[in-house]
Design a protein with these regions (language model features):
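Glycine-enriched alpha-helix->loop->beta-strand junction motifs that scaffold or abut catalytic
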Residues: 70-73, 91-97, 118-121, 188-194, ...
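N-terminal amphipathic alpha-helix/helix-capping segment at the start of soluble metabolic enzymes
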Residues: 1-25, 118, 281
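Catalytic alpha/beta core domains of metabolic enzymes, predominantly
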Residues: 128-129, 137-284
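Alpha-helix-loop-beta-strand connector modules within alpha/beta enzyme cores
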Residues: 58-79, 112-124, 184-195, 279-283
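Active-site mouth loops of central-metabolism enzymes
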Residues: 17-35, 54, 73-81, 137-150, ...
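Hydrophobic faces of well-ordered beta-strands that scaffold small-molecule active sites
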Residues: 20-26, 51-53, 75-79, 97-99, ...
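Glycine-rich, proline-tolerant flexible connector loops at the mouths of alpha/beta enzymes
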Residues: 27-33, 44-68, 98-106, 168-177
Length: 351
């Protein structure tokens, strides 16, 4: 795993070997501070670490004052083109700015934003995607290739460095999973700044989760990436659940219950599909535990096949088994199986 430079977003560390931070973005009207705060609280309850809000106009920038004062999460202002919105957002108390300095005007405007960010020790994320690459770079590479996106990101980094600013995070996103992965791998070779991973315009919950798992999960498995955002055309809370599931899948989660289950076969004598879904749903919001839970379809092979699980259940004809590390610890009536498992999880303290 590559150790990058570290930035601090309120009280959340990103990079430098810190745990992978999960991000999301509100889809409320930022000008409606109460609605935005309600969504931020829901994201926090789901396990989100950092939240981003769109700042399309000055009214939204002013609303950030109330939002930032009451948000349980660090707030990132998403700025496009108008440097005055960045200055207003900083004045309102945001914890980080997301912008591309090459898109906000001349050097004097970049310097103004950098000066304000420095005064409050705020990092800036450079956010490049395949649709934002500068014309001269597109012409050089013949399109928004991974190499073009990385050159665009480094161009913006250079603008900030020219202002003696180094508190930087980078994202380089494409809707193409292969292009996204290639871009981040190249960026990881060329820079030590922390990388914010994501696949842009990933789609609805189903396809967007699959694309994000392939792209984000693949990069994390290779040791690349410091913070992640799963982009879904859906409730932002689902982005957080998907992101945390990806972290579990690649072994990078700091907490959470990793539920595994067998695919069922002719030996299955219980409604394993519904049981597995119920266990997964009930485990989703449990905080402060890190463990593996198995849901298996038969008592013959279940405990043995899932011996690496901390806890698990296996169904039979009328009676279910609860096991720990492959050893049977309890038999319970099948209709009590899930409740009995959840009770064991609640009292599990680890080895």
């Amino acid at each position: 795993m590559k150790i990058t430079k570290q930035i601090k977003i309120r009280d959340v560390l990103v990079g430098g070997g810190a745990p992978i931070a999960v991000q999301s973005m509100t889809n409320t009207d930022t000008r409606d501070a109460q609605a935005t705060l309600a969504q931020i609280r829901a994201l926090a309850d789901a396990g989100c670490d950092i939240v981003r809000c769109a700042v399309p106009d000055m009214q939204a920038a002013e609303a950030l004052r109330e939002i930032c004062a009451n948000s349980p999460l660090p707030v990132v202002a998403d700025i496009h083109f108008d440097y005055r919105l960045a200055l207003a957002a900083i004045e309102s108390g945001v914890d980080k700015i997301r912008l591309n300095p090459g898109n906000i005007g001349g050097a004097d405007r970049v310097q103004a934003v950098v000066k304000a960010a420095k005064a409050r020790h705020l990092p800036i994320r450079i956010g490049v995607n395949s649709g934002s690459v500068e014309k001269h770079i597109l012409e050089k590479f013949g399109g928004p290739t991974p190499e073009a996106m990385v050159e665009s990101a480094l161009y913006h980094v250079g603008l900030l460095n020219d202002c003696d600013f180094d508190d930087i995070c980078i994202s380089i996103k494409s809707s193409s999973v292969p292009n996204t992965m290639q871009a981040y791998l190249l960026a990881s070779e060329k820079t030590d700044y922390p990388l914010h991973l994501g696949v842009t315009e990933a789609g609805t919950e189903y396809m967007g989760t699959i694309k994000s798992a392939a792209g984000i999960g693949g990069l994390l498995a290779l040791g690349v990436g410091d913070t992640i955002r799963v982009s879904l055309t859906d409730d932002p809370v689902k982005e957080v659940y998907a992101a945390k599931a990806i972290l579990k899948a690649v072994g990078r989660a700091e907490e959470g219950i990793n539920v595994v289950s067998c695919p069922t076969c002719g030996r299955t004598r219980i409604n394993l599909i519904d049981i597995a879904k119920e266990v997964e749903q009930r485990c989703q919001s449990i905080r402060g535990k890190k463990m593996k839970v198995a849901v298996m379809g038969c008592v013959v092979n279940g405990p043995g096949e899932a011996r690496e699980a901390d806890l698990g259940i296996a169904g039979g004809d009328g009676v279910g088994l609860i096991f720990r590390r492959g050893e049977i610890i309890k038999k319970v009536p099948q209709e009590q199986l899930v409740d009995a498992l959840m009770d064991e999880i609640a009292h599990y303290e680890g080895e």
